[in-house]
């Protein structure tokens, strides 16, 4: 992993993605960078590869994602040895093929969650690490659009906003630490460490920054880039203020009173066959898969 502080990751993300993404991804990059992930390493839900390229100094042996366009972009990052269009519920790799698996802000978007967790456990070697991040039940409650109506005596309106935001975020699972611990335990993954990240105040900024960053949607559509002026983080006063805030929020530890949970797991040892060769297909992948 790249060893760097939150300020480094904030600067790097603000140059390439909207503020709301930079807030979350910089905090997550700081946490992921603090965990040793031996190779071979699999990235489940690699997306366009931006996050993997940000946190890894060494190559990532394999990445998978359902979106062919995202996979095509991930290939251009130069960090993945192989990338495939594949489902997390049917990973196209041999049993025990990987020493580590990472998955950043992906599991909450997957309806067949149990199948995906079982597949992650299957391809992970005994004693191997699985590191992931997920939203907690606080995600919707901490949004500014949910907080203000509650303060005004309109709790139903606040709850409706939270449900709407989860829906447009395609969140199927925003569960507690205990729920995740039980899910992981059921597939042979022991939760060995966790940390909450992004406080209530951080989520207010997260919510507001969606609207502040609305012009980036047009930029992405017209020019294929979220940010047209990367150096604005240095020269534009509002961006400098935002950068300082993002560092503060990314470094703070809100404990259980957090919108997101970072999980570090270890696969339990068991009597089993010898590890398979890294990246060896145990089944035929989708016809679209490319490695």
Residue ranges and their predicted role:
Residues 1-90, 100-102, 117, 254-262:
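Conserved N-terminal segment of class I S-adenosyl-L-methionine
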Residues 90, 108, 139:
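Active-site micro-motifs of SAM-dependent methyltransferase domains
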Residues 91-95:
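Short amphipathic alpha-helix with an adjacent loop that forms part of the alpha/beta core around
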Residues 102-111:
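A short SAM/SAH-binding and catalytic strip from SAM-dependent methyltransferases
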Residues 110-111, 124-126:
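Helix-to-beta-strand junctions that scaffold the AdoMet/dcAdoMet cofactor pocket
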Residues 114-119, 129-263:
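S-adenosyl-L-methionine-dependent methyltransferase catalytic module, highlighting the catalytic core
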Residues 268-291:
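Short, basic, low-complexity termini and linkers enriched in Ser/Thr/Gly/Pro
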């Amino acid at each position: 992993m790249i060893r760097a502080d939150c300020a480094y990751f904030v600067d790097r993300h603000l140059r390439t993605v909207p503020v709301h993404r930079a807030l979350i991804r910089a905090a997550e990059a700081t946490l992921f960078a603090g965990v040793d992930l031996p190779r071979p390493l699999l990235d489940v839900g690699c997306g366009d590869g931006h996050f993997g390229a940000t946190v890894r100094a060494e190559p990532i042996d394999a990445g998978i994602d359902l979106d062919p366009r995202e996979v095509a972009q991930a290939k251009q990052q130069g960090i993945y040895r192989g990338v495939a269009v594949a489902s997390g519920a049917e990973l196209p790799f041999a049993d025990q093929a990987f020493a580590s698996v990472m998955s950043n802000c992906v599991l909450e978007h997957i309806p067949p969650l149990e199948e995906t967790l079982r597949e992650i456990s299957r391809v992970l070697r005994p004693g191997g690490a699985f590191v992931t991040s997920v939203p907690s039940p606080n995600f919707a409650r901490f949004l500014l659009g949910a907080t203000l109506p509650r303060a005004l005596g309109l709790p139903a309106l606040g709850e409706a906003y939270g449900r709407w935001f989860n829906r447009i975020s395609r969140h199927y699972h925003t569960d507690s630490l205990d729920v995740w611990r039980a899910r992981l335990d059921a597939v042979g993954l022991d939760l060995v460490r966790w940390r909450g990240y992004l406080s209530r105040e951080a989520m207010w900024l997260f919510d507001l920054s969606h609207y502040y960053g609305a012009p980036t949607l047009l930029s992405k559509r017209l020019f294929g880039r979220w940010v047209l002026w990367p150096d604005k983080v240095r020269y534009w006063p509002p961006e400098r203020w935002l950068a300082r805030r993002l560092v503060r929020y990314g470094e703070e530890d809100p404990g259980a009173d957090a919108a997101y949970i970072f999980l570090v797991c270890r696969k339990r040892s068991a009597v089993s066959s010898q590890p398979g060769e890294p990246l060896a297909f145990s089944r035929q992948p989708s016809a679209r898969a490319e490695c």
